[in-house]
Amino acid sequence: EALINRAEAKIRLGDLAGGLADLNVWTQAYLRPGLAKRTFTQAEIKAYYDALPYADKTTRSPKKHLTKAHFKLHDGSTITEGTATEALLQYVLQCRRILTLHEGLRWQDIKRYGIDIYRWKKIDAGADTFEVPADGVLLGSDLRHAIALPQQAITGQIQQNPR
């Protein structure tokens, strides 16, 4: 996980080549030899994510809108859709999602990047049909993302996070 974290930091700082190098070291170690390609170029990653639709209430996809991120990039800008930076961050998030499956760490990425969450519900078992119910969306800006501060901190005159 340290390599993925370092890759994310390098990409956010504008060192796309350094971030990609760390991601390739991780994929070479994580993916089994002979079963899949284990190193990727920036152009290949960008082409892959450019071809995917963004996830929304009607489309299931590993590609998420990252424009609501709660941080700025190294130059003070925000994440722009369709750029190499966005594609590499999408790849970082996908690698981390695979690596930390069932560990509960995805929540931090969801909060940091302001990712909308869609809860898909199977509506027809025979047809393998899914939909997002009306109450099945947690927007990236939803205050339920906020973590409650402990009572000791509130007693010390710190204001509780809005929820």
Task: List each model region and its residues.
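Acidic/polar-rich alpha-helix caps and helix-coil junctions
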Residues: E1-R163
